C-alpha cells in the first residue's frame, strides 16, 4: 500500500512539474520606424490593433512592445514580442485574425509606420514565475 501511495505522490509531483514546464510559442519582430514616423504613430496603430483584437473575442495572445535601453547590438527601433498559450492556440487565433479583411488592414497600418525585417518564432519554457 505504501508503494502505491508513493507512486501516486511521485506521479502527481511529476505531472505538476511537467505542466509547469510546458513550452509556449513566442514571436519576435525586429522593426524600424519608417521615415518621418515616431513611436507615437506606432502607439496609435497599436490602439487600433487592440480594438480589432477585442472584436475577435477570447484570445490567449499577449503582446509586448519593447524599446532598447542599452546594449551593443541595438539595430532596431523596437521589438514586438507576442506569445500564445500553445501552438494550437497560435494557429486558431492566426486563422481568426486573418479570417476577414481586418487582419490584412492591420498589417497595412503597421506597414505604414514601420518596417519589420525580422520575424522569429521561439518556444519559451518558464523556468521561474513570480
Residue positions per predicted region:
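Hydrophobic h-region of N-terminal signal peptides that target proteins for export
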Residues: 10-18
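Sec-dependent signal peptide recognition
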Residues: 2-10
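Non-heme di-metal
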Residues: 102-107
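Short S/T/G/P-rich N-terminal loop/turn motif that feeds into the first structured element of a domain
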Residues: 17-101, 112-130
Amino acid at each position: 500500500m505504501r508503494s502505491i501511495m508513493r507512486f501516486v505522490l511521485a506521479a502527481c509531483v511529476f505531472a505538476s512539474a511537467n505542466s509547469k514546464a510546458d513550452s509556449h510559442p513566442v514571436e519576435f519582430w525586429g522593426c524600424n520606424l519608417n521615415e518621418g514616423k515616431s513611436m507615437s504613430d506606432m502607439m496609435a496603430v497599436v490602439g487600433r490593433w487592440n480594438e480589432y483584437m477585442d472584436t475577435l473575442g477570447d484570445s490567449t495572445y499577449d503582446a509586448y512592445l519593447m524599446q532598447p535601453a542599452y546594449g551593443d547590438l541595438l539595430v532596431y527601433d523596437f521589438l514586438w514580442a507576442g506569445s500564445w498559450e500553445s501552438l494550437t492556440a497560435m494557429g486558431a487565433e492566426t486563422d481568426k485574425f486573418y479570417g476577414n479583411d481586418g487582419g490584412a488592414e492591420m498589417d497595412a497600418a503597421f506597414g505604414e509606420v514601420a518596417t519589420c525585417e525580422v520575424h522569429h518564432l521561439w518556444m519559451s519554457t518558464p523556468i521561474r514565475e513570480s
